[in-house]
Amino acid sequence: FEGDPLFFFFFSVRMHRSHPLAKLPALTYDDLDGQTIISKGRAYDCFRHHIDKYFLAPGRKIHILAETADESIIRTLLLHNKVINIGYDYADPLYPHPDIVSRTLKEEISGQMIYLVSNPQVRKTKAACLFRDYLLEWMKKKAVRG
């Protein structure tokens, strides 16, 4: 397999604006110690990897209230509970609410690169080639515009 880098997703922590952590400009894993979270969950391998590596292995404690990929459930729980959501920054503008704020997770590993992956051993269709070229060109233009 080979991959073309598309963009970097930063980790983002969303919470109700009245949550005590909302007063901080950015958060660390230590800030999240002892917190109640709602997140995508074990269905996503990266969730389990990050929870194990950055929370449980160093001895930090978290309470997982719920695991769901449903943004409407996540937003409802953020609005009505003192929970936080650990996710990626792309979700911040997709599901805006005036009472939900987002803080960047400032750590050595603060996100991950997303790649367009292909198998060079498989012949691509013309449509697949056109889509790949379009997507890569679109990403370049988007990066230039900011």
List the model feature ranges, each with a label.
Residues 1-4, 9-10, 72-121:
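Beta-alpha-beta core module
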Residues 26, 70-71:
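Structural motif corresponding to alpha-helix initiation and N-cap regions
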Residues 13-14, 37, 64, 102, ...:
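Generic preference for hydrophobic
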Residues 1-37:
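Flexible hinge/capping segments at coil-to-helix
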Residues 18-28, 107-110, 121-127:
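Short helix-loop capping/hinge motifs at secondary-structure junctions, enriched
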